[in-house]
Amino acid sequence: MPAAISRNWPAPAKLNLFLHINGRRADGYHELQTLFQFIDYCDMLDFKVTETPELILHSNMSGVVADSDNLILRAAKSLQQTTGFNGGAEIWLDKRLPMGGGLGGGSSDAATTLVALNTLWHTQLSTEELAKIGLKLGADIPVFIHGFAAFAEGVGERLQAVNPSEPWYLVIAPDAHVSTADVFQDPLLPRDTPKLAIDTLMSQPWANDCQKLVVSKYPQVAKALGWLLEYAPSRMTGTGACVFGEFTQQQQALAALAKLPSEMQGFVAQGMNLSPLITRLSHP
């Protein structure tokens, strides 16, 4: 009897509510302080366990390449290698999040793959063990595996659960692809923001140290942010290109979305301190 397909595993987007760069390490990585919060806007993945070890990925988006560099396949392969599981999986990705926009879609897809297959393969790794696998694939992956809003330090791997407010956001995805590597290699990027205690950071105005540089180099980002600032406190997430405005009421965010210029694309979503992946995990 063929295995059933396990459906609707969410891979939520994240926002960096603030992002401070505190320095550059000898290995080239940057020391950061940032606040991650999920939003209820997700890619969705389906999985079918197979008896043979092949890993097969299908996607609804032509830009998703199912090769050895794909994070979903790398995550599944890493779980196979770590656990010695000799079966495989067929995976379907319904890609909804903008690619390369600073919303963490690729990292979230990889995290959901690790969490879902650990359940479906009955490999029984702990959350910490999954996070260690994830960290080798990308610095943002552990926060998606743990599934709670978090204050992060180091290169983003040291996480502390936090509980910020859960407002509504209007997220705009400018028609620009910002290279994270280029941003972090740019000599004009500020790298000297002092490290502060979490209580201080949570109570002061929030900012993104990458924003000024990205806005200066990408006019599409500058235009989107300038428009959004007319309606709400707004800033960039990650290294861009997406920007977000914060609203207390859903209707306020939807009203602003209705006025969005035709050349821009956006969506409204609510902040979530508990990832929908954790909710899905309780109904495998």
UniProtKB/Swiss-Prot annotation:
Among SUPFAM superfamilies, the record links this protein to:
GHMP Kinase, C-terminal domain, Ribosomal protein S5 domain 2-like
The organism sits in which domain of life? Bacteria
InterPro entries according to UniProt: GHMP_kinase_C_dom, GHMP_kinase_C_sf, GHMP_kinase_N_dom, IspE, Ribosomal_Su5_D2-typ_SF, Ribsml_uS5_D2-typ_fold_subgr
This protein's UniProt keywords: ATP-binding, Isoprene biosynthesis, Kinase, Nucleotide-binding, Transferase
Active-site residues, record numbering mapped to chain: K14, D140
What family is reported?
Answer: Belongs to the GHMP kinase family. IspE subfamily.
Q: Which organism is it from?
A: Shewanella baltica (strain OS195)
Supply the name of the protein: 4-diphosphocytidyl-2-C-methyl-D-erythritol kinase
**What pathway annotation does it carry?**
Isoprenoid biosynthesis; isopentenyl diphosphate biosynthesis via DXP pathway; isopentenyl diphosphate from 1-deoxy-D-xylulose 5-phosphate: step 3/6
Specify which residues bind ATP according to the UniProt entry for this protein: P98, M99, G100, G101, G102, L103, G104, G105, G106, S107, S108
Question: What are the disulfide bonds?
Answer: none
Q: What is the lineage of its organism?
A: Bacteria, Pseudomonadati, Pseudomonadota, Gammaproteobacteria, Alteromonadales
Catalyses which reaction?
A: 4-CDP-2-C-methyl-D-erythritol + ATP = 4-CDP-2-C-methyl-D-erythritol 2-phosphate + ADP + H(+)
Q: What does this protein do?
A: Catalyzes the phosphorylation of the position 2 hydroxy group of 4-diphosphocytidyl-2C-methyl-D-erythritol.
In the UniProt record, does the keyword Kinase occur? yes
Q: A Gene Ontology molecular-function term?
A: 4-(cytidine 5'-diphospho)-2-C-methyl-D-erythritol kinase activity
Q: What class of enzyme is it?
A: transferase
Q: Name one GO biological process term.
A: isopentenyl diphosphate biosynthetic process, methylerythritol 4-phosphate pathway
Entry's EC annotation: 2.7.1.148
